[in-house]
Amino acid sequence: MAMDKRHSFAKLARMLKALAHESRLLILDRLSRGECSVGDLRELVGSDLSTVSKHLALLRAHGIVEDRREGTTVYYRLITPGVCNFFTCATQVLKERSR
């Protein structure tokens, strides 16, 4: 039982590490409202295309987002909407701590 819990926490830690970057949080916040092109995400984040692509690749590798191509444009969408619930909880914790 302890090993199962330890394994679960290790997986959770890896996923949280994937979320632990301001640019990735911005990307996920935008994708929570629907699909978006890489170009639009680049403008939102304010980084170069290769940096945004690396952020998206990490999120894709963790099963949080997926992509699709339409011609030369790549679009991303959130496939783990529960991550938004985590943001709500984390924001609430920050509000409570600031009181």
Segments the model singles out, each with a brief description of its role:
Residues Y75-R99:
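Conserved segment of winged-helix/HTH DNA-binding domains
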